[in-house]
Amino acid sequence: MNPASPDFSFETAALAGGALHVAGVDEVGRGPLAGPVTAAAVIMDPGNIPPGLNDSKRLTGAVRERLHDWLLSHARVAIAHASVDEIDSLNILRASHLAMERAVAELSPDHALIDGNMIPRNLGCGAQAIVKGDARSLSIAAASIVAKVTRDRIMVDLAQQYPGYGWERNAGYPTKTHLQALLDFGVTPVHRRSFGPVHNILCQGKSVTS
């Protein structure tokens, strides 16, 4: 049985409750050892939903790219990040919430639908946390696509600056290639020093790549 596709029911309920602008919010990049965490907030027009819109994890790279470009042209979209320094100083959960707060602040919606089971504390609007929201809400699905494509592109650019870690393929996640490269080449300025595998390399006295 195919999993159900996301729909507009959460947005419709919020609009019926008096909200004028409802944003779906998602983030990507909690698990990688390198790079920022990226969040997107998207306000969709209920009368203009692109076919095939779904959780980014259910889509091919080509479809994600196409939908990303469509959303930037046809929806209200905000993208924000929390840096590696912020991740290391705050912790990854708080940093991911900070990125979501920044994205929401750019759109100033009346209500936000947040992927997951926690609501960031400084959203500035009413909000609902939806577990597996990227597979249930079209607005969150849209945000998941924008966030993933944006961050993947950032990691491709960083891979040009720091070759050998495979970020153009692994997006900074701890793949075998990435972990071996840490041993071979050391830690870069865009690695998250608070994350175990990176911290362990530093404790071994591995030189930091400039």
Label every model-predicted segment.
Residues 1-210:
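RNase H-like, Mg2+-dependent phosphodiesterase core
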